[in-house]
Structure formats: C-alpha cells, structure tokens
Amino acid sequence: MMLLKIEEEVRIYEEQIVKSKMESHPHIRLVLEDRGVKGDFRVRDLRPMGLRINGRIKVNPSLDAVQTRVEVKESGQTIICDPAVAYYSSRLQTERIQNAIEAEELRVKIGSPIAVADPFCGVGPALAHLVNRPNLVGQILASDLNPEAISMLNENLRRWRGCDIEESSQRKLQRNKDVWSGVQDARELAENPELLGRWNMMIINLPHSFAEFLPLLIPLMDATKPFVIRGRLVCRHDEITENHQQLLEQMPNSNAQVVLDPRRDYSPITSLCSVTIRNP
C-alpha cells in the first residue's frame, strides 16, 4: 500500500503519477490519496487512486473494491493496521526505537522487567518495539478511545504475547493476566485504583496535548522507583525553555530530568519536540 499527497497544481496528472508509481513498485497493491486526518480519532481521509488486480492497474477504483487493512513490519514484529479506521504512521519509527533504548536502560536501573503504559496506543506500534525484547516488559497498559484501533491492538497483542486476550462487547478496558487493554479515556485512568502507582514507563504520543495530559497521568507512575515518560510536544520556538520548566515543575521529584529535543519545524513559529522525562 502507498499513500500519496497530491498538490492541486499536479492533480490533472494524477493518473500518470499513479501508473508511474505502481509500475516502478510492482509489489504495491493499492495507492491511496492521503487527504490529511479527520475526526476525533485522527483517522486518515483516504481516496483510492490505483488498484492492482491480476497484474493490471485500475485507476480510481471504487472504495468498495479496496481492502485497506494491511500488515507492516517494525522491529521484527508484524503489525496489523488499517489507516482508513485507525491512526498509524511509519514515520514515528525513530521515536519508537528511542523508546526501546530508554526502556532497556530503565530495566537495568530497576533490575526487573518493566511495566509499560501506552494510553494513546492506537494499534500498538510503540509496544511492538518493546514486547519482542527478552525480559524487557512485564505488565502492559494499552488503551485508546478508538474501538477499531483497540480491536486491531488486541489482535496484535495476542500474536506478540502468545496469550488469550478477551474482548468485551464494547471493547472497554479490562485485564487479561498482565495485560490491560481496551477503550478508555486517558483522563479517567487515574480513577481506577488498580492502575495507580504501578507503571515504570509511559508513552504519551499526543503532541498537541502532552502538557495537558501529563499531570493527569503521573499518578499512574510508580514513584518509588525510577520511571520514564516519553512523548512528543508541539510548542512555539520561543517557548521551549518555558515549556521545559513547566514540565519539570509537574514532576514529583525535584531531581527529575526533562529533555525537550526539537526534531523539526511544525509550522513557521512552532517546533515538534521529542520529550523524555526521567524520574530518578
């Protein structure tokens, strides 16, 4: 599958573009126009542009004729995803690899497998980089607001962990041995006493709302041990230092380390920063 963004000035050539792409990449089955994200779940707005059927390329196929559910590989794991119903971005692999590096270092500090929480997990790509490492992860909390994402997440977890994960009819958050998974508003996680003070690592992949959710989720962390919070944050170029201080002030330990690493410009006045918080 290939996603393309088509600028208006070249739209008149889209048929030629699609055929050229598919002829150059014979393994590509489907080409979709990516018209950005939409809705509360930030699902991609996709339009079919080209479909390979029995070796022949059909341009502008009907939506009913295409299957957008695919399997992708990351860190040696196969991830079931469907960009038409659940957010997934392969461009975040660098962040996910860094998560794994931080997790390995944290395990050494703690001296045992770590408990990982991903309250905006989607189909689970961040977890894919962690669960295949020997003795790295013990317990998992994986939640999201999108029921379709949770359905695919549970499929992925069953394969990765080799265990049964039961699903309620509404896919609500529930525990299956060492895995909590399901539909849950991250704002309400701290209302569950079972989840409080339990987690050693948390992933907050919500760039526009990282600072909003951080204080709501800190109570889930096990403050008796070192812990790490990883995520991304969009902020103004001239407010990075201020944001750094604000994040530091929210930590329970004054010796915590906050790293804000600007990765790229998000707009002319804002940066997309990688965030690492280490609580000693």
Name each region found by the language model.
Residues M1-P280:
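SAM-dependent transferase fold signal centered on methyltransferase-like domains
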